[in-house]
Structure formats: structure tokens, C-alpha cells
Amino acid sequence: MTTYALLHTIFFFFVYAFLGWCVEVAYAAITTRELVNRGFLNGPICPIYGCGMTVMIAVLGRFTMPSSDMAWYQNVLVAFFGGMVITTLVELVGGYILYKMFHTRWWDYSMYRFNLGGFICPRFSLLWGLGSVLLMVVVHPLLSKPSAAIPTLVLIWLDVIFGGLFLADLIVSAIQAVGFSKQLARIDELRKAMRTTSDALTEVIGTSACLLYTS
């Protein structure tokens, strides 16, 4: 992998982590009629989506992009089954690690049939497969074109800024999860500032999703 390709991979991790957070907020607003700031972190980001898409791009990208030699229906099949397997594994491993580290579940499929530990279930695996088709066959090719025009220096700065914010949020959220944030006033202030921003986005995205769903 070239340096430029690595920079793009990091960039797309943050792009899809943010888009995943938006999807989670919209889904929660539509299904529960409540505005819920989803995710483990305080900022508007769900890293598990970024991880899933990064792996899918690396593994499935050359088979699902329009430039591949396969027919369109083959692209769709590869994206569906490959994406379903990858996202299910990411969800299982990610959910298990988070539960073991923080003794908290950020999603629970225990109410669905044939679930495994509440971390994965066939119903959502199928949904992830459909979502993978949309992302790999439609969304990612569209995003790849403008992102390819980003100069290397700009891409470096974007990755550094997003990476710094992500690392700070990760540390603050981990401290909060183990219950130390109350003893560290500055950490708690930083957490609240991050949460305020993502709460504002939650209201915008959740309200918009409900309006679109009911219109």
C-alpha cells in the first residue's frame, strides 16, 4: 500500500465512522421516536462503522468498483455476501471487546431469534449485507472520485486533525466509562463540550429522519 493510499484509508475511516453515526441516530429516531446520541464516544462518530468499511474496501474494493471486470450482478453478490460476513465479524468482535472492557452493551440483539450472545443475529446480518451493496456499489465509488482530487498535504492535515480529535475523544470516553471523569474536572469539561456538539447534530439528524419517514 502506498503512502497516499494509506492516507485515503485513514480518511475514509473517519468519513464512514461519521456516516455510520448519522445512520444510527436516524434509525433510533425513526424506530423509537426519540433523539438518541448513539455510540460509545462523545463526538459524532461510530468507529465500528469506520472499521467495517475500511476492511470491506480493502477486501472487496477491487471486486465491487465499477472498474472491475465482473458483471454488475456479480459485483452486487460479492458486496452482499462479502459485506455481510465482514460486518457480522466486526460487530461480533467489536461488541465482545467493548463488553469485556467496559461491561456495557452499545447494541443488544438478545430479543431476536438465533442471536449469538446478543452481539449478532441473522436479521441484522442481512441488513448489513444490503447496506454493504449500497455502500460498495453506489456510495463509495461516488465518494472516491472527489476524494482522489484532494492534495496529499491537505489529506495529511485532515487525517492528523481527525485523528487527534478521535484519540482525545477515545481517551476521554474511556476515562468516563471507568468512572474517573468526575475526579478530573478538565476531562469532564472536554467530554461535555464534545457531547454538546454531537447532541446538536443528533437533534438535526434525528428530527430530519423522522420528518422524511413520516412525509
Q: Model segments located where?
A:
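Hydrophobic, lipid-facing residues on alpha-helical transmembrane segments of integral membrane proteins
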Residues: I10-A26, P47-V55, V59, F63, ...
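Functional transmembrane or membrane-interface alpha-helices that line membrane-embedded catalytic
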Residues: T3, T31-A58, R62-M65, K100-H140, ...
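Alpha-helical transmembrane segments and their immediate juxtamembrane interface regions
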Residues: L155-Q183
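Membrane-interface helix termini and inter-helical loops of multi-pass transporters
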Residues: M65-A71, L142-A149
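Membrane-water interface of alpha-helical transmembrane segments
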Residues: Y4-F11, F40, N75-V78, N115-G118, ...
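Conserved small/polar residues in nucleotide/adenosyl-binding loops
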Residues: Y213-T214
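Helix-coil boundary and interhelical linker segments in multi-pass alpha-helical membrane proteins
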Residues: M1-L7, G61-A79
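Charged, amphipathic alpha-helical linkers/stalks
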Residues: A149, A174-S208
